[in-house]
Design a protein with these regions (language model features):
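Acidic, divalent-metal-coordinating active-site segment for phosphoryl/phosphodiester hydrolysis
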Residues: 1-11
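A general structural motif at alpha-helix termini
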Residues: 11-12, 59, 238
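C-terminal cap/substrate-recognition subdomain and adjoining C-terminal extension
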Residues: 1, 41, 53, 264-267
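Hydrophobic residues in alpha-helical membrane-spanning segments
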Residues: 6, 100-102, 219
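Membrane-embedded transport module
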Residues: 18-188
Length: 267
């Protein structure tokens, strides 16, 4: 009624009925329900929270992968080694490999318990300091795995071969890391098959196929300054991907009291 006007104005989000509500209520409300059906509000909250969570997932993925690239380049420079990645390879990492999984993470479906979470403080930053600590930790694990493979390969195969190994190892590790960023509270083994995301799976497969194509064709190998890989070296790349993925999962388990990785919480 008319007396609802002050309450609607004082509320964080005022909701009025489009048909049954008064003119005063509709004028001061933030949301007017055209069909007078409150069920639409529940669905809107669910989708709104999912959008907020997906933005955080995309930021988590992009910041952690870029942190890993920074660590790889700085780590090699500090010890006085040759560049582990060429400018062309870095450009490929940022323009051809990272965007597809990031875009697909933005389309992740709402998590089953999204409505059980308390509302977020609208004044809080989208990423809190605790979030950055987790993101940087994940980037360090990705970068350290690539650096370890680079230095181990460099002593036995030479700079070009080692650069090829770290290029593929880091790129594929970042692509797979997109699967680990699907949930803030559950690990990759809990979300990989229980909550399918065809868009993300397609993006990961396409990114991996593009990466494989760069290595297969002689023209792209020359363009990116890559060397042919033996079976043993290919298995080493697979080991780098597994080490970074499992490493992040294990560390996420150890720093959290529950069964899943440490959740990203906005306080």
């Amino acid at each position: 009624g008319i007396n609802d006007g002050p309450a609607l104005r004082a509320a964080d989000v005022g909701v009025a009925m489009g048909g049954a509500g008064t003119d005063v209520a509709r004028e001061v409300a933030d949301i007017v329900l055209a069909g007078d059906n409150l069920e639409g509000i529940i669905e809107a909250i669910r989708l709104g929270r999912a959008t907020y969570a997906n933005i955080r997932k995309v930021l988590r993925y992009l910041v952690s992968t870029n942190a890993s690239e920074t660590l790889v380049m700085l780590g090699a420079a500090i010890v006085g080694g040759p560049e582990p990645l060429t400018p062309m390879q870095l450009l490929w990492l940022n323009l051809a490999s990272d965007p597809l999984p990031a875009l697909a993470l933005g389309l992740e479906a709402p998590e089953p318990d999204v409505l059980d979470e308390p509302p977020h403080d609208p004044r809080a930053p989208i990423l809190a300091p605790a979030d950055f600590r987790r993101i940087l930790r994940e980037g360090v694990v990705l970068g350290a795995s690539a650096l370890a493979g680079y230095f181990l390969a460099g002593g036995a195969t030479g700079a070009v071969q080692a650069r090829t190994i770290v290029f593929h190892g880091l790129t594929l590790s970042q692509i797979v890391h997109g699967l680990s960023c699907r949930s803030e509270t559950h690990g990759i083994e809990q979300t990989l098959f229980r909550r399918p995301n065809p868009t993300l799976f397609t993006a990961v497969a396409l990114s991996a196929a593009l990466q494989l194509g760069v290595q297969i064709f002689p023209l792209t190998r020359r363009l990116f300054g890559l060397a042919p890989l033996s079976l043993r070296q290919s298995l080493g790349i697979a080991g780098m991907v597994a080490a970074s993925t499992v490493g992040n999962r294990v560390i996420g388990y150890l720093v959290h009291d529950g069964p899943g990785p440490r959740p990203l919480v906005v306080r």
